Amino acid sequence: MSLIRELLRAIRITLIFWLITAIIYPLAILVVGQGLFPYQANGSIMQNIEAQPIGSALIGQVFASEQYFHSRPSASRYSQGRRARPTGISGGSNLAPSNPALLNRIIEEANQLREENIQPIEDLIYSSGSGLDPHISIQAASQQIERVARARNVQPDEILRLMNKYTDGRFLWIFGEPGVNVLRLNYALDLQDFNNQQNR
């Protein structure tokens, strides 16, 4: 009899913990997230002026046009484009430093940057561990100002002002380095062009 009682008690405790961890806790987090942080809870999805999603401010993407700041290289190519690997996962290339394929990729990136008169700094030739970085360093963004200003036919000071506006500081003021959010900056450039055309 006591064995059955202990078994029923164990089942009851299991059901209570299942109810707490599988239903009550997730629902509480959902309500708090949607109530207090709806933008972040839904993936920080950015929309254009027509309310169409253009990407997440938390995940990098490819920008090939000369009018845009370019993101860091990605081993997964941000799951975009002809040579993308749409795996739905993040990650580096896992190529060893001695691997010729890695060296060839870096040399190719550096040569392409030199053709654009951009100094090949680390941020612009090395991919990150996640392969999905939404930010580039201030130095990497500064290297691209002239090219973007020329392509958009605006003064570099206008681009610099926007770049400073979309530079995120250190996390909790001490962790990491300041970085420029590439998607936010590129969309701000498009908005600026749109507003300039409307005012003409």
Swiss-Prot record:
<keyword id="KW-0406">Ion transport</keyword>
<keyword id="KW-0633">Potassium transport</keyword>
<keyword id="KW-0472">Membrane</keyword>
<comment type="similarity">
    <text>Belongs to the KdpC family.</text>
</comment>
<keyword id="KW-0547">Nucleotide-binding</keyword>
<dbReference type="GO" id="GO:0008556">
    <property type="term" value="F:P-type potassium transmembrane transporter activity"/>
</dbReference>
<dbReference type="GO" id="GO:0005886">
    <property type="term" value="C:plasma membrane"/>
</dbReference>
<keyword id="KW-1133">Transmembrane helix</keyword>
<keyword id="KW-0630">Potassium</keyword>
<protein>
    <recommendedName>
        <fullName>Potassium-transporting ATPase KdpC subunit</fullName>
    </recommendedName>
</protein>
<comment type="function">
    <text>Part of the high-affinity ATP-driven potassium transport (or Kdp) system, which catalyzes the hydrolysis of ATP coupled with the electrogenic transport of potassium into the cytoplasm. This subunit acts as a catalytic chaperone that increases the ATP-binding affinity of the ATP-hydrolyzing subunit KdpB by the formation of a transient KdpB/KdpC/ATP ternary complex.</text>
</comment>
<keyword id="KW-0813">Transport</keyword>
<keyword id="KW-1003">Cell membrane</keyword>
<keyword id="KW-0067">ATP-binding</keyword>
<feature type="transmembrane region" description="Helical">
    <location>
        <begin position="13"/>
        <end position="33"/>
    </location>
</feature>
<keyword id="KW-0812">Transmembrane</keyword>
<dbReference type="Pfam" id="PF02669">
    <property type="entry name" value="KdpC"/>
</dbReference>
<dbReference type="InterPro" id="IPR003820">
    <property type="entry name" value="KdpC"/>
</dbReference>
<comment type="subunit">
    <text>The system is composed of three essential subunits: KdpA, KdpB and KdpC.</text>
</comment>
<dbReference type="GO" id="GO:0005524">
    <property type="term" value="F:ATP binding"/>
</dbReference>
